[in-house]
Amino acid sequence: MAASVCSGLLGPRVLSWSRELPCAWRALHTSPVCAKNRAARVRVSKGDKPVTYEEAHAPHYIAHRKGWLSLHTGNLDGEDHAAERTVEDVFLRKFMWGTFPGCLADQLVLKRRGNQLEICAVVLRQLSPHKYYFLVGYSETLLSYFYKCPVRLHLQTVPSKVVYKYL
């Protein structure tokens, strides 16, 4: 038989499980669990939803049918700073989505080669070339100052979003 020994204002005494003392009872949470499993892919619908090549394939096809969107050596055995690279990737993606509002046609590809950071993007032809030149120079200068390394942007323009298939 399990019994607990509580020492407090009432002194040490042996009790069975009761709610008289705070140390002698257990708490039970009755809120529902919010950790639901969801697949990280686009759901199949009536065939009227346009998706890109990256969205059409599930994540388990990475390195088989599609490539990595972030290329760096942080995940190799013995390498450090994998968490910092992930945070930097999130910041870079949000920065680029904010700098080119509504102009990015697909996901960014981030490449780290030595000390250089390369950002590859497919943009829509919504702005004039002069505005794109300004935004590229602005982004490269500001990100080079933030990361203390050379940052290069490689942009490819398309007239409209590239649709791989309809789901």
Curated annotation (Swiss-Prot):
Superkingdom of origin: Eukaryota
Coiled-coil ranges (or none): none
Molecular-function GO terms, alphabetical: RNA binding; structural constituent of ribosome
One annotated Gene Ontology cellular component of this protein: mitochondrion
Keywords (A to Z) from UniProt: Mitochondrion, Ribonucleoprotein, Ribosomal protein, Transit peptide
Presequence extent in this chain: 1-35
GO biological process, alphabetically ordered: mitochondrial translation
Locations listed in the record: Mitochondrion
Subunit description: Component of the mitochondrial small ribosomal subunit (mt-SSU). Mature mammalian 55S mitochondrial ribosomes consist of a small (28S) and a large (39S) subunit. The 28S small subunit contains a 12S ribosomal RNA (12S mt-rRNA) and 30 different proteins. The 39S large subunit contains a 16S rRNA (16S mt-rRNA), a copy of mitochondrial valine transfer RNA (mt-tRNA(Val)), which plays an integral structural role, and 52 different proteins.
PANTHER family reported in the protein's UniProt record: MITOCHONDRIAL 28S RIBOSOMAL PROTEIN S24 (PTHR21244), SMALL RIBOSOMAL SUBUNIT PROTEIN US3M (PTHR21244:SF1)
Family: Belongs to the universal ribosomal protein uS3 family.
Name assigned to this protein: Small ribosomal subunit protein uS3m
Phylogenetic placement of the source organism: Eukaryota, Metazoa, Chordata, Craniata, Vertebrata
Gene: MRPS24
